[in-house]
Amino acid sequence: EFDTMIATNAFGMGVGEATLTPAAYSMIADLFPEEKLGRALAVYSTGIYIGAGLAGVLGGWAVQTISGADPINLPILGAIKPWQLTFMVVGFPGFILVAIIMFTVSEPQRRNVQSQMTGKALPFADVLNFMWLNKRTFGSIFVGYALGGIAFYGFLAWIPEFIRRTHGWEIGAAGMLFGLIYAVLGAAGTLTGGWVCDWLTSKGYRDVAIRSCAVYFALATPFMILTPLMPSMTLAIPMMAMMAFTMSLQQAMTPVAIQLITPNEMRAQATSLFFVASLFPAIGFGATSVALVTDFVFDNDYAIHYSLSIVGGVMMTLATIALAFGIQGYSESLARSSEWRDTP
């Protein structure tokens, strides 16, 4: 029963998240002009970091507060155990947010539509054909973010364990430290990146979304290499903070890039394909790649700091090259978008 419930919850969350973000990106692109799109998507994207931080803080509070309580009886549901009540408490605010969104957010007027199939779903083959026409742009974004994601998710998975093995901290304290850094500096970096994108767009640099991605990946690379190699936590913490900040600068840039070069009726599907192409390798091989280097290159569990440095350095360098390769293609995609865009 427990396994079935957890699996059902995980499936439902996955479907919800996979549906929400592509649709949200497309709606935001209809609500805001190009010169404000970076900040708008950045504000939305900070939810990743703020949510992760709140999950740690509020989730920990809920577990500590409720775990020792006695089961309670609720109408219809019957006896509720403490662990079940914990899920209910942390999940209930979601219903409040759903109600607020349902009654305050309306469907925006669609802009930048290429097809005449108003109100009908566009065939998936048409989306693939469009992406093939812009293959240099989408290819560089997909490959660049898959490679960068391997480095990033490798760090997310192993940083607490690295701090424990290398610097002797308790795993709980290490996780809380990195979680706090990730939440605060990640949100700050995302907002900064969105503001810089809009400022440069207003100055006439329309290719800034993809160009800045390459720059931000390049900026984050040395911090990914050096953070695990610091001899003390006194030095590792500021390096970790800079890594979180520079890595998050690009968080809203690819959504901006995809929304600007893709017609309205294709945007959500294009974004979904981006998530599939980038997150599958990142989540599938991020943590695994660090473990493989640790086991088969160094054959030493306490060499994890070297593994993090190598995986981070190699993957981020390749990701930067891939994104830089797409800059010219992105400029060409922007030029083609003038055929169907409502505004210049």
Specify the residue positions occupied by each region the protein language model found.
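Helix-loop-helix hairpin linking two adjacent transmembrane segments in secondary transporters
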Residues: 44, 48-103
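Juxtamembrane intracellular "pre-TM" segments in multi-pass secondary transporters
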Residues: 107-142, 166-169, 343
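Glycine-rich segments within core transmembrane alpha-helices of 12-TM secondary carriers
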Residues: 39-67, 182-190, 275-287
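Cytoplasmic membrane-interface "Motif A"-like loop-to-helix N-cap segments
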Residues: 198-216
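Cytoplasmic helix-loop-helix junction between adjacent transmembrane helices
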Residues: 8-49
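Multi-pass alpha-helical transporter architecture, strongest
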Residues: 97-104, 221-230, 309-343
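Extracytoplasmic gate region of multi-pass secondary transporters
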Residues: 134-193, 247-251, 255, 282-290
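Helix-loop junctions at membrane interfaces in 12-TM secondary transporters
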Residues: 1-9, 226-239
